[in-house]
Amino acid sequence: MTELSAFAPLTPAEEKLLTTCAGPERVTLGEGALPGEEAGEDVTVRAALLRELLLGLYEHPLNPKGLRLRGARITGTLDLQGTDCSQDITLSACRIEGEMNLVNASLRGLHLQGCWVKAITADNARFSGSVYLRGESHVAGEIGLAGARIGGDLQLCGVTIDGGGQDAVFAPSLRVEGSAFLGNYPYAEGETTLTCRGMLFFSSARIDHDCFITNCAVDLPDEPLGHEAFGATEEHGSDIAVSLARARVGGILYFQHNEIGRVVNLAGAEVARFKDEPSGQGASYPLRLDGFRYSDFSRHADTRPTERLSWLARRPEELNFNAQPYEQLAHVLGRMGHRSDAQTVLMVKERLLRAENRRLRAETSGYGPRWLMMWLSDMVLRFTVGYGYRPGRSVAFAVVLIAGLAAFYQATWNAGDMTPNAAPILTSQPWIAATESHPEGPGAFWSQPGQAGQDWETFSSLAYAADLVIPLVNFGQEDAWAPSTSRSPLGRLGWGLRWLAKGIGWIVTALAAAALTGVIRRD
């Protein structure tokens, strides 16, 4: 403890502080407004004197409420490194010209309202209470909270932070036993903001309750830290604006109404509930979602698959495709009862995953036969059964195929190229006579009432097409009629088309059965 005589002569502001600090009222210097850089001794207090007061200058004990000071110009570094301070530090409209050094300190609470601060370094500090920076405060340097422990809430609301080439907030492994509010405090009247020049780095942080990141504007300096040690979108890379990588949030992560031009990193984070804006003007920033886990969406969150798929697609360009974010979204949507939406997400995931596999194949082996087979099989699975998630597509595909074939074989019939599929009939006198008298349509003439084939199976182009496509059902058309290869090109084309239609029919039927029975693995 330093003797009071060491601070002689005291400034008028220091004398007022010493004589009134034990009282229940806040000590106000001057008019209580934020002092300028050239403020006089009537509001000037040395940080070293404040340190002694906080640590127990016995002749002038503080009120149990702690240090409560307004309108002071505090000179020098407030150095509490490694100390045990049982007092709250509450400063309002104060200019703190030196750094606040709270490294490894134990304090009750830190509350800054409308202050100007050079920088705050509180790595591994212990706060039994809360940490508040509010009321249009300005921090000219970095706020360091690496490894700090906060027993209450963390509020950075109504604050401007200029990291001075460093991070705006550097808080890896921060532990908050309450909630964290960055930007707007939702439980008060009016709205507040957080404006930063520098990264908000909360990697591996743990927040026991809720985390609100709203009304935040984050810009990065021209030469951000970490641009050489990490890739642009890695850990502390040059393109990371907000990092909650591997963070744990016990309540809701509320991420909305922000202006962020670079990457938001949620890789490996885990939250109980999630609320954000998947689309819109404020949702243009890239997202790292690989490994991001959330148990549920807020009831007011937009869970439409179109919006959520756009959200997932906002990964940084240099980041390779990862299936986990799609599987996580589908899992949560399924638990919410949105099964069709979950299947839509998984179907898109499968399409993108297969496209990524084809890209890797092309990079290693070029666009050869193997790549072509991969592409062909992917297209068949995609459009026939939706990779197993939409087996009903096979029915629609079959209907379209049957309709197309029906139109073709009706044209073939009209051209006279459909003949009875029986050798004895083709050599019979009535059929030969029909081909001679009506060469433009012998089948239609031969099978009409009053002719030799009136009791033969009546031709139906629709049933004939269904007979070809559906392998498990026999409509009798293919047994009765067949295209002729000795007449017009339609007959020759129709004869070969039968085999293609049968092959496609078998493939579609097999895929539909596999999708319905789960043979096509979907998980």
Feature-to-residue mapping (PLM):
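N-terminal leader/targeting and pre-domain segments
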Residues: 1-377
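Hydrophobic, well-ordered secondary-structure elements that form the walls
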Residues: 342, 408, 516
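A sequence/structure-level signal for intrinsically flexible, low-complexity segments enriched in small
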Residues: 361-368, 394, 406, 410
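Pore-loop/selectivity-filter region of tetrameric P-loop cation channels
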Residues: 373-391, 415-504, 511
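Long, positively charged binding patches that form subdomain-scale interaction surfaces
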Residues: 380-408
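C-terminal substrate/ligand-recognition segments
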Residues: 397-401, 405, 499-523
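Membrane-interfacial segments
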Residues: 412, 416-420, 517-521
